[in-house]
UniProtKB/Swiss-Prot annotation:
Binding site for xanthine: L20, N27, K157
Name of the protein described by the UniProt record: Xanthine phosphoribosyltransferase 2
Cross-referenced InterPro entries: PRibTrfase_dom (IPR000836), PRTase-like (IPR029057), Pur/Pyrimidine_PRTase (IPR050118), Xanthine_PRibTrfase (IPR010079)
Similarity section: Belongs to the purine/pyrimidine phosphoribosyltransferase family. Xpt subfamily.
Function (record text): Converts the preformed base xanthine, a product of nucleic acid breakdown, to xanthosine 5'-monophosphate (XMP), so it can be reused for RNA or DNA synthesis.
Claim: Nucleotide-binding is one of the keywords in the record: no
Organism encoding this protein: Clostridium botulinum (strain Langeland / NCTC 10281 / Type F)
Keywords tagged on the record: Cytoplasm, Glycosyltransferase, Purine salvage, Transferase
Name of the gene this protein is made from: xpt2
EC number: 2.4.2.22
Compartment annotation: Cytoplasm
Native organism taxonomy: Bacteria, Bacillati, Bacillota, Clostridia, Eubacteriales
Any one annotated GO CC term: cytoplasm
GO biological process: purine ribonucleoside salvage; xanthine metabolic process; XMP salvage
Pathway: Purine metabolism; XMP biosynthesis via salvage pathway; XMP from xanthine: step 1/1
SUPFAM superfamilies: PRTase-like
Amino acid sequence: MKLLEDKILKEGILLEGNILKVDSFLNHQMDVKLFNEIGKEFKRRFEGCNINKILTIEASGIGIATIVSQYFDFCPVVFAKKVDAANMDKDTYESKVHSFTKNKTYNVRVSKKYINKGDKILLIDDFLANGCAALGLIDIIKQGGAELAGVGIAIEKGFQKGRKELEKVGAKVESLAILDKIENDKVYFK
């Protein structure tokens, strides 16, 4: 998606360890106009998949998933929680997820009330690196007896193993901007 690639080139900041900082428009301050175009593009790519629910993980995927929902008849958006909360149901589906950026493992949870047999779920997230978050969410979908319709990613680090890991479990992966490499303080797209 050229619009997203242009935004990355213009506003993205490269940090040590191949970390692309896009907090000015994607995962801290949100460019809602861009998100709207992202929603339209995911609708185009997942047209006909009969999606009735969107699943993401807190926190950075929530904004994108909410906008994407508009293009799938305002279907519910569910997000997996990384932290225990007093108001969280005790009856949950759980999976372990390792964060590439934070180098930390989380036990993510979704209430059993929100993932059901017969659901056709689209996973949405801001980044795909090693695939750990998406694999954890796919595990939760399976625990609930629901069906994975596909995985929609804003930015994929194509030089990491995430896509291969997701394709191994049969996931349809659609990424809007695929980084081919980060070299000499420059981003290259596939």
